[in-house]
Amino acid sequence: DDADLDAYFKYLENPKSLKSISPSGKFYQELGLDKELVNSFVNIEPGADQGGSSIGKAELFLSLFFNDVGNSEGGIDPETGEIKKAKGDNNWEGVGNLEVKGTNGRLGQQGGRGLDATDTFENLAKDLLSDEQLKEFGDRFFKKPWTMSTSIAELYKLAMQNKVPETKIQSKINKALDVVYFNQNLANDYFKTETDFTDLEEITKNLLKLNAASYSKAKGIDAILFVDTAGGENRYVIVNKSDYDKTIDNKKFWTTTKGPTGFQWTNVNPNLVVAKD
């Protein structure tokens, strides 16, 4: 209504920068504006840009409310006619390409549409287990989409029992994970010690760190903003790529499944949500 528009235009007289607000919180509180006004802008979905990239919720809001954020548009090369995809969703001044993820956003393709990594997992097990172990392991883990954390921990234990050198076990698992996560060769940065491969909570944290870092490296992304576009409170968390590990350790964003079960070999890029206060 007119009052909301007046409040918005008044805000534009002295807009905030994205860098100036808390790295996590609620947008309407940080901006000092009515919650419904902010929600109405967060929920705008303009469609696709010239390059065919979908402009999702909160992307336009960021460029309209923060003076250091602009739209990151795809386009057509005037010389070649080639369609160029935008890197990230917004340009964040002084930071780089900002990716925006709404409720249930993924750092990769949706399950069933992207990579099904079950073949990679089965080949990994064949490399590390005896025939007898493989049959029992396959009966448990190949016939339904078992979680990555549980299956990695069990595979590690059985491979050790099979007298496979620990360095080889770790190397084989990490190579398989690098295939799954955009071939960026970052798994060794996260999976280093026995605990990294056997503790279900640590495995899940490491998978999320690897997913975020590899996705960002592959896509040229410098920061990610997660925003709850479904709860009506516009809760958010902003994460520079240098802070992914710390933010994930603190579970500021996490899989929709609270336990260490969100990653599956048939769904290696699970839905993610902003943590509640």
Cite the ranges covered by each PLM segment.
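Active-site beta-strand termini and strand-to-loop segments that position acidic
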Residues: N90-G96, V100
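Short, positively charged
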Residues: D1-K85, V100-D277
